[in-house]
């Protein structure tokens, strides 16, 4: 769900077995106090805090208030990049690094599957790179949609135009277990059961990117440092 924020509602949803919503509202001060209390744990483990979602930039004002209150904690913004440019760059600069999703390069295809243009996303990616903010590009690989040879090659060409390269390209293969999550919320899962990624196409893209000097990590494979 984290890499598909456009599928999420902005308000709490009940799944089919839920009788009540148990979440609670937090102030920036209260959350900062809680996170800072784990600072020693983060330091020993080499960990930190990742803000994902949904889409964390939808809570940009809250995060802008929260981040300065965190003391010596490594932070990651995991985002679709769909955000007002000025607000996005101000927010991104406050994080240790950014995980930036790139799904589809063709604008018509992007509108078809997400309901929105990708113009602001690609513009934000370019602006992020221009400001030399540390970032990783993550590609959710949806069978026959984002994992096609044409789309992956287009993503490759977009990355080559960036003034500063991503620290890595992270390939996220499709996992059909997501279908069960849709069912719990009474939503129709539109992909056919049993559908799989074309791993030959993905491996060719990975090999080509590595030959061009990119560090590429495929989820499920051992990360090579």
What are the residue ranges of the model-derived segments?
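Canonical Radical SAM [4Fe-4S] cluster-binding loop centered on the CxxxCxxC motif
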Residues: 1-25
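Short glycine-enriched, charge-decorated loop/helix-capping segments at active-site entrances
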Residues: 17-21, 111-117, 186-194
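Electropositive phosphate-/nucleotide-binding environments in soluble metabolic enzymes
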Residues: 25, 149, 196-199
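Conserved AdoMet/S-adenosylmethionine-binding subsite of the radical SAM
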Residues: 32, 36-183
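A polyampholytic, Gly/Pro-enriched intrinsically disordered region
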Residues: 97-98, 189-194, 217
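C-terminal accessory regions of radical SAM enzymes
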Residues: 150, 172, 178-181, 203-225
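A structural motif corresponding to the C-terminal lobe/cap of the Radical SAM core domain
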Residues: 167, 183-208
């Amino acid at each position: 769900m984290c890499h598909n924020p456009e599928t999420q509602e902005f308000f709490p949803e009940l799944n089919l077995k839920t009788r009540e919503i148990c979440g609670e509202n937090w102030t920036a001060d209260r959350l900062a106090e809680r996170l800072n209390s784990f600072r020693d744990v983060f330091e020993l483990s080499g960990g930190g805090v990742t803000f994902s979602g949904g889409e964390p930039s939808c809570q940009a004002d809250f995060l802008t208030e929260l981040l300065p209150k965190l003391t010596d904690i490594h932070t990651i913004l995991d985002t679709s990049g769909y955000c007002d440019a000025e607000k996005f760059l101000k927010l991104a600069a406050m994080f240790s690094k950014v995980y930036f999703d790139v799904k589809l390069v063709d604008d018509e295809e992007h509108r078809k599957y997400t309901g929105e243009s990708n113009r602001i996303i690609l513009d934000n990616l370019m602006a992020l790179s221009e400001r030399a903010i540390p970032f990783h590009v993550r590609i959710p690989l949806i069978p026959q949609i984002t994992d096609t040879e044409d789309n992956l090659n287009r993503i490759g060409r977009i990355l080559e135009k960036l003034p500063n390269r991503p620290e890595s390209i992270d390939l996220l293969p499709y996992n059909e277990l997501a279908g069960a999550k849709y069912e719990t919320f009474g939503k129709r899962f539109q992909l056919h059961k049993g559908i799989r990624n074309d791993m030959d196409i993905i491996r060719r893209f990975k090999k080509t990117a590595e030959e061009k000097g990119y560090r590429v990590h495929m989820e499920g494979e051992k990360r090579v440092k």
